């Protein structure tokens, strides 16, 4: 078992409006079902454990492309949307934000009893991962969201998020069971986060001596521990002013590299984890996206010959704007991990609730949903042609990207989206009444 990724995200307030929350639940369910249909439940958990894919997944559903709320809204949408399909798809989601996270143990026990798992072992895993991210990594983030995703075969992934009020950031931690072998030796598969300077990482592979020393100290008499600490402070020239723990910690951080103390910047160099750091600005900028990849999507949607071929693949007449969205959704379903290095690009499927990069085009969103749901329903009845065409759409877009030079004109694309927004029932939170539903 290993933490698969980490992401740092700017803290944003507010809630997801009802009109978007309902659509996110439906689209999230449809995307999940497509992945499970084509690749299996294990593949869905692998994707969920990648912080870059997770960010693209949220962006393609119309959530803010970079804020802390993407974690809460995506997991809330999945929990609501998959609840009635859990046994059919073999995917169960437990926990949530705040008080809902405290329901995780009981929810796990109920599922374990139904599926024949060791419920207490799952509960132990849930608690250990939360403790590692809350306590064993001194990065200043307090966990407030904990979601445990379990498959019918017993594989699991965990997505949890902490906040740091002082920095105004949230940090998302990803875990995945096939990668984790030791809870106290580099267990994460990924972390999404911004550099917070020097931290103490007690689950680093090099931290075994520090872990052993801490266990030894815990068994010593308190008086002996304090005397040795005072002696150490005298030798290092640190004056005891009453804040003994703080001074000792800072001294250790500066000198004890062998004890697993390291800068967050070296995390990416020393481990195989995926690390995502989102910028502080709210608007989408050209440097946030791969313009050639976006250009390929737009070429397929708007160039007549390419558009006609894409329609042949999908066996349906579609407008260019809907085809643009479906091409990006298809990439989320079928794309390789390297395709998600620019998650902001996926906000060009359905915009963002805060108008970044443009308002959510509800008509396009619903057309995308209807196509995907219709393709899935047909596949359940044995007709897989549309779903197969949806897979080939991703390959076609990548072929266009490789064989042509389709770099997008960023300003022109934004201007076009803003111009057509009224005709597509473009909507944002600024158009809504003050009261909006909570995420869970």
Question: Which ranges hold each PLM region?
Answer:
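HhH-family (HhH-GPD) DNA N-glycosylase catalytic core used in base-excision repair
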Residues: 1-440
């Amino acid at each position: 078992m290993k933490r698969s990724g980490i992401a740092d995200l700017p803290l944003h307030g507010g809630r997801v409006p009802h009109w978007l929350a309902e659509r996110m639940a439906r689209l999230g369910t449809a995307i999940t079902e497509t992945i499970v249909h084509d690749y299996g439940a294990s593949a869905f958990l692998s994707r969920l454990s990648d912080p870059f894919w997770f960010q693209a997944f949220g962006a393609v559903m119309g959530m803010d492309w970079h804020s802390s709320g993407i974690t809460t809204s995506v997991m809330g949408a999945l929990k609501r949307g998959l609840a009635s399909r859990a046994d059919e798809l073999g995917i169960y989601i437990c926990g949530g934000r705040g008080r809902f996270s405290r329901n995780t143990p009981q929810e796990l026990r109920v599922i374990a009893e139904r599926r024949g798992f060791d419920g207490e072992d799952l509960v132990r895993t849930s608690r250990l991962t939360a403790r590692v991210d809350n306590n064993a990594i001194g990065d200043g983030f307090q966990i407030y969201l904990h979601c445990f995703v379990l498959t019918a075969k017993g594989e699991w992934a965990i997505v949890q998020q902490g906040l740091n009020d002082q920095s105004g950031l949230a940090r998302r931690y990803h875990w995945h069971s096939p990668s984790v072998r030791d809870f106290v030796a580099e267990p994460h598969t990924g972390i999404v986060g911004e550099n917070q300077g020097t931290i103490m990482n007690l689950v680093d592979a090099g931290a075994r001596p520090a872990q052993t020393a801490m266990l030894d100290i815990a068994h010593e008499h308190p008086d002996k521990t304090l005397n040795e600490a005072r002696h150490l402070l005298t030798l290092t020239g640190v004056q005891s002013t009453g804040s003994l723990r703080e001074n000792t910690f800072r001294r250790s951080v500066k000198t004890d590299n062998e004890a697993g103390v390291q800068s967050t910047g070296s995390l990416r160099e020393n481990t195989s984890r995926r690390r995502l750091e989102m910028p502080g600005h709210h608007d989408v900028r050209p440097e946030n996206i791969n313009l050639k990849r976006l250009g390929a999507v737009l070429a397929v949607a708007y160039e007549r010959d390419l558009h006609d071929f894409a329609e042949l693949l999908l066996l349906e007449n579609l407008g260019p704007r809907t085809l643009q969205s479906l091409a990006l959704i298809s990439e989320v379903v079928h794309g390789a991990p390297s395709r998600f290095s620019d998650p902001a690009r996926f906000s060009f499927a359905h915009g963002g609730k805060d108008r970044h990069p443009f308002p959510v085009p509800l008509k396009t969103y619903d057309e995308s949903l209807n196509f995907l749901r219709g393709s899935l329903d047909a596949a359940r009845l044995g007709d897989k042609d549309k779903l197969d065409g949806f897979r080939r759409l991703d390959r076609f877009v990548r072929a266009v990207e490789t064989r042509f030079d389709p770099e997008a004109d960023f300003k022109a694309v934004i201007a076009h989206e803003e111009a057509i927004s009224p005709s597509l029932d473009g909507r944002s939170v600024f158009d809504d009444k003050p009261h909006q539903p909570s995420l869970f």
